Amino acid sequence: MNRVVKSIVYGVGIVGFGYMTMKLTTPSPERVVNSLPPDLRASYEMNKKDRSQAEGVLRMIEDAKRNPKNLV
């Protein structure tokens, strides 16, 4: 029984250390965008705007599929 508990504690410690390391070293999406050069940031913002418009169209299509009576 002692070996099982010891193994669980070590396993949790290793996984916890890995998770903490990941959280501390991975930058947030905003930080990545802010670190981009101005031309790439402008391109990113333009693509983001295009994606939001496309998502709006897809949302309208999904709504039309759910409620076909509201099309007229």
From Swiss-Prot:
This is Assembly factor cbp4. Belongs to the CBP4 family. GO terms for biological process: mitochondrial respiratory chain complex III assembly. Its main location: mitochondrion. It is a single-pass membrane protein. The chain crosses the membrane at residues 8-24. Keywords: Chaperone, Coiled coil, Membrane, Mitochondrion, Mitochondrion inner membrane, Transmembrane, Transmembrane helix. It is found in: Mitochondrion inner membrane. InterPro entries: Cbp4. Essential for the assembly of ubiquinol-cytochrome c reductase. It has a direct effect on the correct occurrence of the Rieske protein, core 4, core 5 and apocytochrome b. It holds the Pfam family CBP4. The lineage of its organism: Eukaryota, Fungi, Dikarya, Ascomycota, Taphrinomycotina. It comes from Schizosaccharomyces pombe (strain 972 / ATCC 24843) (Fission yeast). The keyword Mitochondrion applies.
